[in-house]
């Protein structure tokens, strides 16, 4: 490579040894250069990237430091027409021990004249009353793996029934256990399976609520209604609670569960706590609803089955035979 600086027809050659050679005096005023293979340089014209042209020059040096940088051309990759579509993840399976428990309960109910969907109301009511109410989620998983509950609409109807059973159980077992249960279930709910209905949005503690609650109370207690309420003559807050809240707000609502569904909440939740008097009253009340003695025995045995599953002994509750004379 050479550089030249014309001065009085003197040319200074910069040799390949990186030193300036002695000046040459030339008669030719035009600069000369040492022949050497020319390097290729590209002079990018200062235009937009779309119209920019590139020309081949043989200039030995061209300063392009202040030229704009070419715009970055983003490359987009088209999705393959054979791309695998997104698939719904498989439904989780319940614990095998619980699956066996639920199989036993549903099999026993199938031997009765009771509607087949009543068994899981008993199941959720006994589990929420147990030492481990969060395992209501196992019942939900078991059910949604069954063919009748494979669609979002069927699962929405299912969760309405399970949720109402848990809500009714609040007045039997307290509020904390049902809250733990519904939170555990909600972890497995898919968005399309959720139900946003609000059954008690417009509830009022009014005369209609009082009449509805008292009517349901009298249906179960019949001739024993007055005598039972008289237990609370010296504790009238409890009498008010029974009529306005227990039976008015909670147990007489028929927006989701029917009469028999409600008894499949109340009797199992009470009996699971090994409560003598209330178990007697609600074995009797279930018989008064028209459930035959043999079917009530199956209900009693299923409650004992769930209690035994958790290692709970129900030794204070009466048998169905012991209550029969009071029906």
Predicted features and spans:
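Alpha-helical oligomerization segments
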Residues: 258-271, 275-327
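N-terminal mitochondrial targeting presequence
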Residues: 1-79
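Detector for Asparagine
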Residues: 27-28, 43, 56, 66-69, ...
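Short, low-complexity intrinsically disordered segments
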Residues: 16-18, 38, 117, 201, ...
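Acidic, glycine/proline-rich low-complexity segments that act as flexible tails and inter-domain linkers
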Residues: 2-3, 7, 75-258, 293, ...
